[in-house]
Amino acid sequence: MSTNTISHVGDLNDEQALSFFGTDGIRGKSQTFLTNSLVSQIGYWCNHVLLGEGPILIGQDSRASSERIASALAHGLATKNREIWLLGLCPTPAVSHLIKKYNASGGLMISASHNPPEDNGIKIFDKTGEKISLEKQIFIDNKLKRKVLIPICKDKDNCINRNDLLKDYKNSLLNTVDKESLIDIPIVLDLCWGSASSCGEKLFKALGANVISINAIPDGEKINVNCGSTHLEHIKKVVLESNAQMGFAFDGDADRMIAIDGKGRVIDGDHSLYLWGSSLQDKNMLPEQRLVTTVMSNLGLEKAWLNRGGKLTRTPVGDQHVHKAMLTNKASLGGEQSGHILSTLNDLCGDGLLAAIQLSSICNRKGILLSEWRDQSFKPYPQKLISVPIAKHITQNYLNKSEKFRLSIAEAELDLGKEGRVFIRKSGTEPLVRVMVESIDKLLVESLTTKIAKIALEEFN
């Protein structure tokens, strides 16, 4: 395979010695990990990396703990005399967009994305609307590890409720497509009891769609529970029963999206990336015909995109890695199989709502059903992913040193040959090791994934 058409970025076994930051910010159990004391310290040390005189924005998802965490963050942030704008319930990409629009010094989003309701997290953005750099993460991480006593401001007079700004974010999305571009198209939205419920239905109705919304009210006890982008059974059923043309399922903070076509079939981030990318490529609007994706993306996507004459860059897992590679390669579109899609339309911030209105609007403009468009794209290689629970102290280096585990991977790679691959990754947000096997032989995929996962369970618990 030619190196000028596909490239890899980063060391896939890299592991930063961070105690608090994972793949996407700080995340853990809301009651036992994200205590008021820790959260206030996070806010305080954010003052040292989010520089400038502009306001600091705080957004949140619907989790029961989000209000408490927002208050504790504000206590820590209030030690510096600048305004703190409380956005309330909103999607993560809204925080990023509003930081740039209002020249804010930075922002924080309180969410644990697709994690269960009892978890929560904090994503930190600098004044560019981008997630803070690794250097800034290390600074905050080191300060938190040392448990330095910090001054806490009891008054929060500089906190201002600005939930009125959500309309600016919604309008920015509407401006990316033709008005009324979804007239009378039946579309199902799974709003996941989370952030997408703040504006998702209004957004699609403004474009003329006949919207059927499920899990549509913000509910901190139900967010991500058997719904949203990681639990698709409900939306599949509703799409089929309602004869909708398509459906879109979001995660807790609406930065990722998985689509369902009118036949009830899943269109994950790989397919979304290919479909949107091919539309841009056809209009000569894709620089170098390049897509950026991660090591988890399907080989079917890779081969199909190269056959179109495109270039593909793979990165480690995490939208921040995709973002960095897009900047380096001057790419305009990238994403992850999990449903994060990044585009220059919104300054390379993963945005599930943007991806959803783009796909649906392109379908309407082409005069094609999403199911038909999917059939014209690519056939994924059989791929199986098992998330294996492991002890909390297990690191990537520990995984690499297990002879039995390494041997099972090597044997699997021999069995697969050139038409398949094994990928092992420790989760950056949960005590899990993800075992993925991919090949043209479905039965071989099943047996090898199960075998490696069983050994991982035995070795790392």
Curated annotation (Swiss-Prot):
Signal peptide span: none
Pfam families listed in its UniProt record: PGM_PMM_I, PGM_PMM_II, PGM_PMM_III, PGM_PMM_IV
Enzyme class: isomerase
Gene3D superfamilies the record matches: Alpha-D-Glucose-1,6-Bisphosphate, subunit A, domain 3, Alpha-D-phosphohexomutase, C-terminal domain
Keyword Phosphoprotein: yes
GO terms for cellular component: cytosol
UniProt KW Magnesium keyword: yes
Listed PROSITE patterns: PGM_PMM
Phosphoserine modified-residue sites: S113
Details of cofactor binding: Binds 1 Mg(2+) ion per subunit.
InterPro entries with a match to the protein in the record: A-D-PHexomutase_a/b/a-I, A-D-PHexomutase_a/b/a-I/II/III, A-D-PHexomutase_a/b/a-II, A-D-PHexomutase_a/b/a-III, A-D-PHexomutase_C, A-D-PHexomutase_C_sf, A-D-PHexomutase_CS, Alpha-D-phosphohexomutase_SF
Keywords, ordered alphabetically: Isomerase, Magnesium, Metal-binding, Phosphoprotein
GO biological process, one term: UDP-N-acetylglucosamine biosynthetic process
Cofactor list: Mg(2+)
HAMAP family attached to this UniProt entry: GlmM_B
Protein role: Catalyzes the conversion of glucosamine-6-phosphate to glucosamine-1-phosphate.
Similarity annotation: Belongs to the phosphohexose mutase family.
Protein name: Phosphoglucosamine mutase
The organism's taxonomic lineage, starting at the top: Bacteria, Bacillati, Cyanobacteriota, Cyanophyceae, Synechococcales
